[in-house]
Amino acid sequence: MLFGRLTERAQRVLAHAQEEAIRLNHSNIGTEHLLLGLMKEPEGIAAKVLESFNITEDKVIEEVEKLIGHGQDHVGTLHYTPRAKKVIELSMDEARKLHHNFVGTEHILLGLIRENEGVAARVFANLDLNITKARAQVVKALGNPEMSNKNAQASKSNNTPTLDSLARDLTVIAKDGTLDPVIGRDKEITRVIEVLSRRTKNNPVLIGEPGVGKTAIAEGLAQAIVNNEVPETLKDKRVMSLDMGTVVAGTKYRGEFEERLKKVMEEIQQAGNVILFIDELHTLVGAGGAEGAIDASNILKPALARGELQCIGATTLDEYRKNIEKDAALERRFQPVQVDEPSVVDTVAILKGLRDRYEAHHRINISDEAIEAAVKLSNRYVSDRFLPDKAIDLIDEASSKVRLKSHTTPNNLKEIEQEIEKVKNEKDAAVHAQEFENAANLRDKQTKLEKQYEEAKNEWKNAQNGMSTSLSEEDIAEVIAGWTGIPLTKINETESEKLLSLEDTLHERVIGQKDAVNSISKAVRRARAGLKDPKRPIGSFIFLGPTGVGKTELARALAESMFGDDDAMIRVDMSEFMEKHAVSRLVGAPPGYVGHDDGGQLTEKVRRKPYSVILFDEIEKAHPDVFNILLQVLDDGHLTDTKGRTVDFRNTIIIMTSNVGAQELQDQRFAGFGGSSDGQDYETIRKTMLKELKNSFRPEFLNRVDDIIVFHKLTKEELKEIVTMMVNKLTNRLSEQNINIIVTDKAKDKIAEEGYDPEYGARPLIRAIQKTIEDNLSELILDGNQIEGKKVTVDHDGKEFKYDIAEQTSETKTPSQA
């Protein structure tokens, strides 16, 4: 906090506040201690105004001790509470509004009056202080607010009226203490000062990625000038931030823009103490340049080269390359100052420096742990933005969320409000119907409810004031989870049980295949427990096996268990990539080709949803060169699209399916389901498929995959389970039409027998169910048989399928029997 502008009496008030906190054994200095400090200075305007309302020091002490009492013995440094910081901030704002260049006791009182949620506000309420009258009394005691340094300010800026109307004076704002402190940028500020001190071409341009703190460096220079921490050459300089949009705005006729800009330049040259700051420097190029007119950059060039105009620019690397570098004459007039992204350690220091401002604004405590979590989590999971901007945004939003959560009106108050509204409407209706006795009773009820509401509201507010709201690591994790969709909050008991039983969940849809299900489940648990390699995807798998054994189904089941919907996965059908050039569809078309602006089918989806299951289906169908693009994804967890953006794959599960080697197995007569020597068959299938996989794909690709899993062939028992699962799905579909279907075990066995095919796996079962049940049922429905609301039993008598239609009883009204 900035205490340099406090008067001696105001400084004594803060010292008294600290003494009162120590006397009362309190661990922090709050608004109540500031109020006690004001009362300890009886000659101050604040104390005199309060005394005029019959508020004395003894009364204030009595109220404070009644409200919060004495604390335990406290040892250690006293810190200001967020509300006390807010009061100091508001007092500075009041001084600025009254055009005072100092902060006195009267401004602190105005700050306490404006901050209406602390203990001091409750003391004022208990002592029946009329806030509006007290404020008017303070302003009256100060005399005419226009009589301070306004005239001096006007005379100072009279030399540059046009510039003052088009630009913000950063030095004045820095003097008011409203600029955020600049931390850890001493090297860059020193370099800017060195360039500004040159004889010619003394124009630094700050170049860096968006959000690294370029504008903050210009603000840091303004603060250094105000604090007298600059060389003699820059003392008493004014840093003016020029907005090119304001300069162009309203210039309707030719020559108007040029005239306005020339006027600004003349004022700067005559004043001799102005440093011009142009944020988004690339807007100079082309600004005001209508047909036949000269743009802003060409008007400024001569003055920039001669050193008549000191200008600081700020722009991003991309904009500098596109707009400034292509104009060599403009580029040589500026000296680049590279602004790099700060490290994690530096960002933590920056956030700790800004903590007071955010605590005062949100009125909560921000812990060191929350700051460190914000920096680490934003650095790890928000890959398309830069520190410190993304970490600051994270702290700001999390603080806002915590503040709103703690100040949401409780349900009991909302219920009383609704009851009051209801009684009020009933009373109005009774008056309208001239039922005055009933209306009088309702009026009494309304008065009673309003009193009850006020008591409950005061009780809630008192509880809120007594409670210190803090920002925790968990709050930060919640916000970043909302930004990215990646679950980062602590694992609760329900989720823990869900993760531990993930195998059972997957087996509800995938019959058999224990090896594959176990590998996938372990990868998900590792990631959720925070043990996975942070530079690689959660897991990458190749599923091998004959067609129809559940490779794609397992990927769908995983997507459903993680996101609640099996369509939530990103599916890439590799049969669409049989040509070499089709790889451009994954990362986007090259510049100059159709579709360059649309982005890649894969990269765009992952950018939008970084936490996802990606399925590359039937990989052996794609051109072999397509897989070269996946090498970096599997190893480093990132991929660069055609626009140069790095897409983060570190929070994805990559599943590739293939039935490579199936043809060779068929030739060797090992394909098929069931068999006498299942273990021996599986080993033969496994060896054959792995051998074919190595022949089909390059070793550097296979070496980057976490696990290659060969799926087992399905047994007849597993086929029967699959039939039951498919019949249950059909039952659920028919229940929507109010048809209850029961399929007997004999019918299921016959379907499994008819759908059994050693070459095609489980897929023939779908066709068998269509042929044996769905076709006949559809004929029954369309043939005029009223089977809606009835029970249909499907059985097999050894020769053919039988369909028995009967009325539903109370026991058969649910489809769960199928």
Swiss-Prot record:
Q: Where is this region: II?
A: 471-662
The UniProt annotation places ATP binding at 208-215, 545-552
What do we know about what induces or represses this protein's expression?
By heat shock. Transcriptionally regulated by CtsR. Up-regulated by heavy metals such as Cu(2+) and Cd(2+), but Zn(2+) and Co(2+) have no effect. Forms part of an operon with ctsR, mcsA and mcsB.
Give the residue ranges for region: I.
Answer: 163-410
Q: What keywords sit in the KW lines?
A: ATP-binding, Chaperone, Nucleotide-binding, Repeat, Stress response, Virulence
List the GO molecular function terms. Answer: ATP binding; ATP hydrolysis activity
Clp R domain ranges (all copies): 3-144
In the record, biological process GO terms are: stress response to cadmium ion; stress response to copper ion
Keyword Ion transport carried by entry = no
Annotated region described as Repeat 1, given as residue ranges: 6-71
Q: Which Pfam families match?
A: AAA, AAA_2, AAA_lid_9, Clp_N, ClpB_D2-small
Residue ranges of domain UVR in the record: 417-452
Region described as Repeat 2: 80-144
**Purpose:** Required for growth at high temperatures, probably by acting as a chaperone during heat shock and targeting heat-denatured proteins for degradation by ClpP. Required for biofilm formation. May act as a chaperone regulating CtsR activity.
Q: Which family does it belong to?
A: Belongs to the ClpA/ClpB family. ClpC subfamily.
Q: How does it assemble?
A: May interact with ClpP.
- Tell me the protein's name: ATP-dependent Clp protease ATP-binding subunit ClpC
Encoding gene per record = clpC
